[in-house]
A protein has these predicted regions:
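N-terminal beta-alpha lobe that positions the nucleotide/phosphoryl donor
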Residues: 1-146, 153-155
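Short beta-strand scaffold segments in enzyme catalytic cores
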Residues: 157-160
């Protein structure tokens, strides 16, 4: 199974496969906006990691290769991309993890695992409960992870 997805891949337009954040980044990229190059690790990889307690066979090598192609040595942003975030009525702002300036394979592996583990965090569970958000199809939100080229911006912002 191919767990890595690029903006051009048809699966990039499935939030259930890549998470909401990568889905919106892919839509912006396809609309012609300047979006830094990125690769998503699919939610299926997260499901496999939870089910088996380890990385899917061969995925770590693929991740390292993709990260090298994104210029890991200059720093990557590792971003959570959950199925339950950036929703119409709930942003989930601050509930999931983002790591900046990741420059080594060891750090990359660690930060991806932290993103995966964050899906089941007490903070996320409390957020879901407080807002009465139910997701009966899974016990915790599915988590994609984004590996994205760093942009060392002078100013940044977000729009809803």
């Amino acid at each position: 199974m191919n767990y890595l997805i690029r903006f051009e891949d048809d699966r990039a337009l499935s939030p259930r496969v890549v998470g909401q954040k990568f889905f919106y980044l892919a839509k912006a990229f396809r609309a012609g906006f300047a979006v830094p190059q990125a690769v998503a690790i699919s939610t299926e990889a997260h499901q496999s990691y939870i089910s088996h307690g380890r990385w899917p066979d061969g995925l770590l090598d693929e991740v390292f290769k993709s990260a090298t192609n994104l210029d890991l040595s200059k720093g990557l942003s590792i971003r959570s991309s959950a199925t339950l975030e950036d929703l119409e009525k709930q942003s989930f702002a601050g509930q999931y993890r983002t790591f900046l300036q990741v420059v080594s394979e060891a750090e990359l592996k660690d930060k991806i695992e932290e993103c995966w583990k964050g899906a089941g965090s007490q903070a996320v569970q409390s957020y879901l409960k407080a807002r009465r958000i139910h997701h009966p199809e899974e016990q915790i939100p599915l988590m994609g992870v984004i590996m994205q080229k760093m942009v060392n911006a002078i100013a940044a912002g977000i729009a809803f």
